[in-house]
Amino acid sequence: MPLNSARMNDYRLVLGDKELKPIMVGGMGVNISTRELALEAARLGGVGHISDALTADVSDRLFGTHFVKDKAKRCAPFSGLAPKTDMEFVPEEIERATHLCVEDVMNRKTGDGLVFINCMEKLTMNDSFKTLPHRLNAALDAGIDGISLSAGLHISSFAMMAENKRFRHAKLGIVVSSVRALNIFLKKSSRTGRLPDFVVVESPLA
C-alpha cells in the first residue's frame, strides 16, 4: 500500500485477543499524561496511559484526599535533617491512592480501547521499590486494562503480581532500552509461567 494513501484504520495493533487502533500514548507523570488523555485514546480504540508517579498528590488534587499533608505532618520532626531516609509515604497510602486513581479512570472509560498505567520501578521517592508491589497490585485490583513496566529492569515485578487474580488476564508489558535488559527481564519473569504481552523499545537504535 502506498504510504501517501495509508490511513490509521488500515492498521491494527493486536495484544493477545484484543485488536486495537495503532494508538499508544501517555505515561508521563506527574499527571502530565492526564486521565482525560488516556480516556480519549481508549475512546478512539487505542491505548491510553496514566502514570503511577506521585499518585498520592494526584489523588489529593482530584479526590480531596490528604496523603501529602498527612505525610508532611508525620515527617515534620525530620525536617532539615539529612539524609531524609525516614521521610516517606506509607506503602498502604500509595496503594490506596493508586486504587483511587485507577478506579476513577476505569469507571469513566468508554469505547473499545484500553487504559494502561505506566508503572516505574525507580521513582524520586524514598524506597520506591518497597511501594512497587502495592502500586502494581492496586492497579490490577482497581481494574486497569494493562500495565507498562518502565524505569528499571523489573526483574521482580511479575513475581510481585503472580498471586493476583488478574495477573494472567491484564495486558502486561515492559519498556526496555536494550536486548540485554529484555533478556534479563524475560529470564526472571519466565519463572512465573507468564511472558509479557508486549515490549516497547526506546533507544537511539529503536
Listing of model-derived features with the role each one plays in the protein:
Residues 1-206:
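Active-site entrance/lid segments in N-terminal catalytic domains of soluble metabolic enzymes
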